[in-house]
Structure formats: C-alpha cells, structure tokens
C-alpha cells in the first residue's frame, strides 16, 4: 500500500517519471535502424578457384576436394557445398549464427593456404574468398548502357571504376559484374589460310607472345645525365597486331591479317546482359551477412552522383532494381496499423467507460508504454522491422489491459461513493496482485522463445523481447501513473453519460444480466461443460495435425528472381536468343516494371533474370498470382525453362537454385547418384504438391570425344602435348598475351574464327606441324565421336550431391510437399547408398516442425510454474490454464477459414493467446479467492460473484486485445502477408475463447475445489491459502 501511495500522493514525481520514459523512447526511436526483419542471415563465405579449360570432373577432383578437406576442419562450419563447372569451382561455407564472420574469414584464408600445395600448378591465381552469400538476391542492381561505347568498354568502366568503389561502402559484401567481359584483342584464325602458308597455331601464338613484351630495358648514364630506355615493345590495339609478321613463306612475309581476323573485342564473347531489351552491363550488389539493408542501400544511393561523375557522359548509369522501397512501404503499413490499433483500443475503452475524462487515462498510458519500449530496443541492438513493429501493435491491446483493470476497479469504488484518492489507493491495492500476475505470466510465455536456438529463435527474439519490455513498462505505468491520474482526475460520482452512449450502457447491462442467467444454468450442468472442454482439447489435437504448415508466410516483396535452364547441349548464341525471348514475354506483362537478365560464363545453358514488379497499389495481383500467370506463357518456349520465384527476406543456405525449396540427394557412389537422380526428379515432377521441379545435376552435356592413335602419332613425330595445344589454341579462347594499360590489364585471345567452327567438320580442318615441319591433319592420328559429359559436379561435405529444387503450387503448403516427397522416396525404393534430405529453408522447416509442440508445452509449463509460485497453489494455475484449449481451437479454425497455413507467425499468435486468454481466468480466480477468504462465501457463490463483477473488465480487455489485432487482419498493401496470419490467429482465438471461457473457467474452478476438498486432510476448511 505504501508503494502505491508514494506515486498517488506525489503526482509531479510520477508525471516526470513518465515523461522521462517517453523522452528516452523518442530518442531511441530516432536512432533505431530500419530493416525488413530481424538480423537472421547466416555468416556465409564463398571461395572461388579457376583452372581455365579444366573439365568439371577435373575441377571437382583436383581443386574442390583438396580445398573441401582443408576448409572442413574450420570450427563452426554448419554446411559446406561446392559446385564445379568448366574451368571454375565455387565452395560455399555456411557458419553457425554465433560465428564472427571476420574470424571465420581469417580461418578460411588459413585453410586455403594449407591446401595450396595440393592444388594444380597450372592455376593462374590462388583461390579467393568473399564474405557474401551468392544465393541471396541482390539488394540493388545497377545497369550501364550506351549508344556509343561497346559492351567491353562498359564492362571495363564497371569493373575498374565502379565496382571497387561500391565494394568499399559499409555493408556491401560483394559486387558481381556481369553481361560481358573485359576488352581484349581477339585473333580469329582461318585454318585453311594457315594450312596454305604452312603455319601452325603454335607458331601464331609464339609470334604474338614474342611481339608483345613488357620488360625493363635499363638506363644510360653519363657524368651528368641519366636516360631511361624505352622501346615500342608493346602492341595495344587490333590495328597494331594486324600487320604483325608471323612467318616467311618462300621469302614472302606472312602477316597476321593474312591468316586471321583481328578485332578489338572482349575476352569472353559468350556473355550477354540485358535490361528491358537493351544490351547492358549489370552490377549486382549483395550485402554483408550482418549488414542492414536499408542503411547499405542509402549509402550506395548517396554515392551514385559521385560515381556518375567518374564515367563518361555517354554512359547511362541507372538503378534497375532496389529492394528498399518495398521494405519502407511495408514498414509504413505496419506503422499505420499500429496507429489504427491504438485508436481502436482507446475507442473500446471509451465505449465501456462512457467518460472522456476516464478515457484520457489509458489514452496516456498506452503511448507511454509503447514509446518507452523504443529505448530498450535501441539498447538491445534491435531494429524497426516488421516483427518488432507487429509486437508493438499487439502490445497495444496488452498494455491497455493493465490500465483498464486498475481504472475499472477504481471507477467502481468511485461509483460507490468513495473519495478519489482513497478509491485510487484501495482499487490499486485490490488489483495490484492481479495485474502483476497477468503481466508476469504473459512475459513467462516468451521465455521458451528467448531460449530457442537456430534461425527461428533468432527471428523471434526481437518480437519476444520487444513485447516483454512493453508489458513491463505497462505494468510500471499501470501501478504508478494510472492510479495517480485516477486519484486526481476522476470525480467521486457516477459520470454523466452522453445520450448517444446510454444505449451502449444499457446493452452492456443487459448482456451482463443475460450472462448471469446463463451462468447459473451452466453451473447446474457442469458435466456437459466438462464434455465440451474435453472436446476442445481433442479438436485442438486434430486441427493441429491436419492443418497445412509452412515455415514462413510467402512474401510479396515486389521482386521476382528467375533461373533459366536450357538443353545441356545448347550453344551460347541460341541461349542468348532464349534470354531475349523470355525477357520479352515478361516485359509484356502489365504488372512488370523492369526486367534485367544475363547469361554466359562457365555454364552456357543457364541464365538469371531479376524482375521488378509495379508497386502494390498499381497492381491487383500478388507476386504468386503473377508467377502463375507467367508460368503458362513461359511454358510455350521450346528448349528451355524459366523458373520464377518471389524474392524473400529470409533465404537459408548457400545453394543457388531455380526455386524456393530444395531437396538434396547425397551419395558416396557417383554412379548411383547419377542413376537415381533422374528417376527421383521425374517422380517428384508428377506430384501435384510440387511445381517447377528442376535439378542442378547436369551430366548430359554434349561432348566430342577425341581418341588419339599414339602409335601413329609417334610415327608421324607428334606428341600429345602438341595435339592438346592445337585444340586449346583453336577452340579454348586461349589468352596468349597481356596488354598493360595504366588502370588495368587486358588480354590477347586467340581461337579459330567462329565462322569456321559451326559444325564438327571444323576438326577436319585442323593440323599439327610435326618435328620435320610437315603439316599433319588431325584426322590422320585421331578419331572422334560424340558423347555425354557433365556440365557441373556438385558436392556437399565430401559427398557427391544433387539438389532438386521446387516451388509450391497455389493452395499447397510446405508440409504437403514434404509429406509427398517422403512418400515418393518410399515408393521408389531408393537404395541406402543414396540419401535424401531437405536443405535450406525446407530443412529449417523440418527442424521447426519437430520443436513446435515442445515449444508450446514449454510455454504452458513456464506459465504454470509462474502462476503456481504467485498463487502458492498447484490447483489454481490449472484452472487458469483451462482457458487455452478454446483459444487454440479458435485460432486454428480461423486459419483454416482464411486458407492460411500454420507458420512461424501463426505460432507466435498461439504463444500470445496463451498469455492473453488466461487473463480472464486470472481476474475470475483472484476475486473468487478474495470472496472466499473475506466474504465467507461458498466456492459456487464466490465464483459466480467474481464472474459477474469482472464481466465488464473481461469484456474490455478482450475487446481491446481483439481490436488491437483486428487491423492486422484487415491490413493490405506491402507486407500484409506477414501481418495477417498473426491477426487471424489472435482474433480467432479471442473470439472462441471469450465465448467458452466465461463458462468453462467457473466450472473448472469448482471441479478443482471439490477435488481439493476430497483429498484435503482438513475437509471442513473452505480455503487453504
């Protein structure tokens, strides 16, 4: 009593305390960063290595395996995957959440150094690493286009000037430049002209290399001067290479231009990038795992004017894609929802109290509690994101509950004629323990969430802490500011009602009277109520088992990502045509704003596309509906598939795949894996629960297999090295010399002119100069035949791996898909040598599924323990917890009604309901116990009186929580797919709980009281507390 009196009788101190809390909250709000979700990115490091010309199998065995053995020893590696393709290997290391990315990078560098001696000596450079996840969607894509400059020049500007500068910006993890390659001088040889002149490809290569040499020439000195010697030993342009003499034939000079077409071009012509049907260079920017996306994007945007000044005016630098606008729009929607929730909650209070003066009190308590929470969020290192703001939106109904309970009880004493200050003191004393019990038991619900590990625990921690802090501040405010304002603002008389509100008051009285009559009937038919309660428990179990489940709601971020997968034998020219065709189909869709894509590199039959949709207020369809519409049109394109998926704020794993979910096959027997993967993929493609089924196993690429006749070669004076050098010179885009410029180095690339390599007959035109100087056709000592070869070799850990990716059709959930895959694997009878497991987001979903029931049980057990400690009773907590089954039924039925799967967001709603609905029972039980102790009432009389007496605050608190959550259900716009499942769960649970617990709680209270008396050693004692 003295504690409450201190704040009631010292209003200035109480007001200043509340002002201090508010000011700290405002300061914290201004300093909080903005993000779509809490920081949940796994630390990921990508290691890259190259060996030009090496086959995927060679790269896997000689480069990937030694590196994997060394990298696999690093502490904290949770997953290691690799992909080896023509001439390149990429290894993705995913670390545990608590692993520092910088420390992990040092360990990665040490592991690379340790493996260096085991790597092939012909590698042009050491393996490198980058602190970025290549499977993440770029946070921003910049494009360079020009009507004046070539693609090579644009690529040079992008890679030499723009990318290094952008990489230095805080938060940027990787800048990937695509769409072309660096400028180069390309030498396209005419094999027939070479044969006529008796010049081999090696002769040409040697002549070019010897003609372009950059070495120091020294200096001349006399007694007083020094001269640096400089020569014209370098050739820099195609025009300078063309007249180069490479051979003399019968005394006549054979120049390079006589046997080749020499052009200023690019290093790799098998690269193409486009934006909205126009050739472009792409800069794909990804953030560091721990970086804030909004801050990083803002920093890049601030740097763009400076970057524009470093490139010529004829080059157009544009932002093709930016993830931040939809994130900001989503947060603005949540903030609007929060404001609406506060307004609705205050309206509920006003309708029940029917007094503007009384309504001001909770109207002040709510913002003080919510704003003060921002200070704690800042101190905890949190951000303003969808989940933390949703926590504050839900907290609106919670924080007003405490103020309502205190205010309503004080108002009851005032209406009975008690003086204001005395009523404030007496009313607060009566409900102080009730408010404390409600708040502590509600916070207790979140303790299991705070202890939860992995990605779900990291994701929900900010939500749980934010809500708990808001409840804690609300508890402080309700026991200090609220009674003080009641004591000094309210009058010791029944407040005058406005005429238009009297009807609501009469309706409330009639409702209370009707409830009293129905409660009497219920208390005389307790067995029927018991059956209903048991039925809700059984219905909970059945609904939970049958409801579709997923990991996280499918978001509409306004960005789509597409992966092109074409026939494995497709040429680059045909693949570029497919890219253009797909881009045209997508660009013609009315919901699409921008399309950017590229193809080429080490995997000729693949490409990537990034699609920006129009803002949500300019389109009526969701991202998934747009994908469904485009899927029908894209399926008509022959020879290639484009798999679309909506970019999500959460993506787990480092695998680059063409769909949202992955199922990985592992085997130590590569032959078994290659045998079973097509069978499994074809089976999964027939399942109605899956869509866009595809695989990263590509072992059916076209290959021309040459078999040397070594005896013939020895007789003709030709060795294998000379023959292989011929093929590399002719078809390998061989980099034979380096052109040094002040800002960069460029290559001279030699190959047979593509005009002469359009079919297999090009091999018949190749010849080798033997040791006697004679031209020997390749066909004299080699035979060739087409064969199949892998385009890529994939590992996970140290096992061969193949990942099958899939999306979900409209109306199907991840639980449906995972169950269907498990059944299919069983039906196929896959041998034990091939192991299947879900990967990425699907793997986290499986782990979360296994822990959800345990988490709910842990939350209930924690609440029971806290209530047992507060009430010093084993029985009363059970009475209070009996309210939960009805809430669970309501929540699950509401999800079914709205066709929403049970996700991590819905799980939060269930946890919140555990904390919300028990408040009704706490108010009933508290007053019933008080009536038994001091009113000498029987248990039935006590609980009946408690139910009627607390009917108004129960209705107020429940409706406040319901109206606080209702805007989440009704909200549209950006991010609504995250908010709606939470609102649906809470509203459904509250409605069902309110209908049932007003009757089941009294019955359970009486049941346990009779049970207590039956087993009590002192059966005549009414109350044991």
From Swiss-Prot:
It comes from the Bacteria. The keyword ATP-binding does not apply. Keywords: Cell inner membrane, Cell membrane, Membrane, Transmembrane, Transmembrane helix, Transport. One of its GO terms (molecular function) is xenobiotic transmembrane transporter activity. It is found in: Cell inner membrane. Gene3D superfamilies: Multidrug efflux transporter AcrB pore domain, Multidrug efflux transporter AcrB pore domain like, Multidrug efflux transporter AcrB TolC docking domain, DN and DC subdomains, Multidrug efflux transporter AcrB transmembrane domain. Coiled coil: none annotated. GO terms for cellular component: plasma membrane. InterPro entries: AcrB_DN_DC_subdom, Acrflvin-R, Multidrug-R_MdtC. The chain crosses the membrane at residues 3-23, 333-353, 360-380, 387-407, 431-451, 463-483, 528-548, 853-873, 875-895, 897-917, 953-973, 984-1004. The keyword Metal-binding does not apply. It is a multi-pass membrane protein. SUPFAM superfamilies: Multidrug efflux transporter AcrB pore domain, PN1, PN2, PC1 and PC2 subdomains, Multidrug efflux transporter AcrB TolC docking domain, DN and DC subdomains, Multidrug efflux transporter AcrB transmembrane domain. Pfam families: ACR_tran. Part of a tripartite efflux system composed of MdtA, MdtB and MdtC. MdtC forms a heteromultimer with MdtB. NCBIfam families: PRK10614.1, RND_permease_2. Belongs to the resistance-nodulation-cell division (RND) (TC 2.A.6) family. MdtC subfamily. PANTHER family: MULTIDRUG RESISTANCE PROTEIN MDTC (PTHR32063:SF34), PTHR32063. This is Multidrug resistance protein MdtC. It comes from Shigella boydii serotype 4 (strain Sb227). The gene is mdtC.
């Amino acid at each position: 009593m003295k504690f409450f009196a201190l704040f009631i009788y010292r209003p200035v101190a109480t007001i200043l305390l509340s002002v201090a809390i508010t000011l700290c909250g405002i300061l914290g709000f201004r300093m909080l960063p903005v993000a779509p979700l809490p920081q949940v990115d796994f630390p990921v490091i990508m290691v890259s290595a190259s060996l030009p010309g090496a086959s995927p199998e060679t790269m896997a065995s000689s480069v990937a395996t030694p590196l994997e053995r060394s990298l696999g020893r690093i502490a904290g590696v949770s997953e290691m995957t690799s992909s080896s393709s023509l001439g390149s290997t990429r290894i993705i290391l995913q670390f545990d959440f608590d692993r520092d990315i910088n420390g992990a990078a040092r360990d990665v560098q040490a592991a690379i150094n340790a493996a260096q001696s085991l790597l092939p000596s012909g590698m042009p450079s050491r393996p490198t690493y980058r602190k970025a996840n290549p499977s993440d969607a770029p946070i921003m894509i910049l494009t360079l286009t020009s009507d004046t400059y070539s693609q090579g020049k644009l690529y040079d500007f992008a890679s030499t000037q723009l990318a290094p500068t952008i990489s230095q910006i805080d938060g940027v993890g990787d800048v990937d430049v695509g769409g072309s390659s660096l400028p180069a001088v390309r030498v396209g040889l005419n094999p027939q002209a070479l044969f006529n002149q008796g010049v081999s490809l090696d002769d040409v290569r040697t002549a070019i290399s010897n003609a372009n040499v950059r070495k120091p020439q020294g200096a001349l000195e006399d007694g007083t001067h020094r001269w640096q010697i400089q020569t014209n030993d370098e050739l820099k342009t195609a025009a300078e290479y063309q007249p180069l003499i490479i051979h003399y034939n019968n005394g006549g000079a054979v120049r390079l231009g006589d046997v080749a077409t020499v052009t200023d071009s690019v290093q790799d012509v098998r690269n193409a990038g486009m934006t909205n049907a126009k050739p472009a260079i792409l800069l794909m920017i990804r953030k560091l795992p721990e970086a804030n996306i909004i801050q990083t994007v803002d920093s890049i945007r601030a740097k763009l004017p400076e970057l524009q000044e470093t490139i010529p005016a004829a080059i157009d630098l544009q932002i093709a894609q930016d993830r931040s606008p939809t994130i900001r729009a989503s947060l603005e929607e949540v903030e609007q929802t929060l404001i609406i929730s506060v307004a609705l909650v205050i309206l509920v209070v006003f309708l029940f109290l029917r007094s503007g003066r009384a309504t001001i009190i909770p109207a002040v308590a709510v913002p003080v509690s919510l704003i003060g929470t921002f200070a704690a969020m800042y101190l905890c290192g949190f951000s303003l994101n969808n989940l933390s703001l949703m926590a504050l939106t839900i907290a609106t109904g919670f924080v007003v509950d405490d103020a309502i309970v205190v205010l309503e009880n004080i108002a009851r004493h005032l209406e009975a004629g008690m003086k204001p200050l005395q009523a404030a003191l007496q009313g607060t004393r009566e409900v102080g323990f009730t408010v404390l019990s409600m708040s502590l038991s509600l916070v207790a619900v979140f303790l299991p969430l705070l202890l939860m590990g992995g990605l779900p625990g990291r994701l929900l921690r900010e939500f749980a802490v934010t809500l708990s802090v808001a409840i804690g501040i609300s508890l402080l405010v309700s026991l200090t500011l609220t009674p003080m304002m009641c004591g000094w603002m309210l009058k010791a008389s029944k407040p005058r009602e406005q005429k238009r509100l009297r009807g609501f008051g009469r309706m409330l009285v009639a409702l209370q009277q009707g409830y009293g009559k129905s409660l009497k009937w219920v208390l005389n038919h307790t067995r029927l109520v018991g059956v209903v309660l048991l039925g809700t428990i059984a219905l909970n179990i059945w609904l939970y088992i049958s409801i579709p489940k997923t990991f996280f709601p499918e978001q509409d971020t306004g960005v789509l990502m597409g992966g092109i997968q074409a026939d494995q034998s497709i040429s680059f020219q045909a693949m570029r045509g497919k890219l253009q065709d797909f881009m045209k189909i997508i660009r013609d869709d009315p919901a699409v704003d921008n399309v950017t894509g590229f193809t080429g590199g080490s995997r000729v039959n693949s490409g990537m596309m990034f699609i920006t949709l129009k803002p949500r207020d300019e389109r009526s369809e969701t991202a998934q509906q747009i994908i469904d519409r485009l899927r029908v049109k894209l399926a008509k394109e022959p020879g290639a598939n484009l798999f679309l998926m909506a970019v999500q704020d959460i993506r787990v794993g480092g695998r680059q795949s063409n769909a949202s979910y992955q199922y990985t096959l592992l085997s130590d027997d590569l032959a078994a894996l290659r045998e079973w993967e097509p069978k499994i993929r074809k089976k999964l493609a027939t399942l109605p629960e899956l869509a866009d089924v595809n695989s990263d196993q590509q072992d059916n690429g076209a290959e021309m297999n040459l078999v040397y006749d070594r005896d013939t070669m020895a007789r003709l004076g030709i060795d294998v090295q000379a023959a292989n050098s011929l093929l590399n010179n002719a078809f390998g885009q061989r980099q034979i010399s380096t052109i040094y410029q002040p800002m960069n180095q460029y290559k001279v690339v030699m190959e047979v002119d593509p005009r002469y390599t359009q079919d297999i007959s090009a091999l018949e035109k190749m010849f080798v100069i033997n040791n006697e100087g004679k031209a020997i056709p390749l066909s004299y000592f080699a035979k060739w035949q087409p064969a199949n070869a892998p385009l890529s070799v994939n590992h996970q850990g140290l096992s061969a791996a193949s990942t099958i990716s899939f999306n979900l059709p409209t109306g199907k959930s991840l639980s449906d898909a995972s169950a269907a895959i498990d059944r299919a694997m069983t039906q196929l009878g896959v041998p034990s040598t091939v192991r299947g497991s879900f990967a990425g987001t699907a793997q986290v979903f499986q782990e979360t599924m296994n822990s959800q029931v345990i988490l709910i049980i842990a939350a209930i057990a924690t609440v029971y323990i806290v209530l047992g400690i507060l009430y010093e009773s084993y029985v009363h907590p059970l009475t209070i917890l009996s309210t939960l089954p009805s809430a669970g039924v309501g929540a699950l039925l509401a999800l079914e009604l709205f066709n929403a799967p049970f996700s991590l967001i819905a799980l939060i709603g269930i946890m919140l309901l555990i904390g919300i609905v028990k408040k009704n029972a706490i108010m009933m039980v508290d007053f019933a116990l008080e009536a038994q102790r001091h009113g000498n009432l029987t248990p039935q009389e006590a609980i009946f009186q408690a139910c009627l007496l607390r009917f108004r605050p129960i209705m107020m608190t429940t409706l406040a929580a319901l109206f606080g959550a209702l805007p989440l259900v009704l909200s549209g716009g950006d991010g609504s797919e995250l908010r709606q499942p939470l609102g649906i769960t809470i509203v459904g649970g509250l409605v069902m709980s309110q209908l049932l617990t007003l009757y089941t709680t009294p019955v359970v209270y009486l049941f346990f009281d009779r049970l207590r008396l039956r087993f009590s050693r002192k059966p005549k004692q009414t109350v044991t507390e």
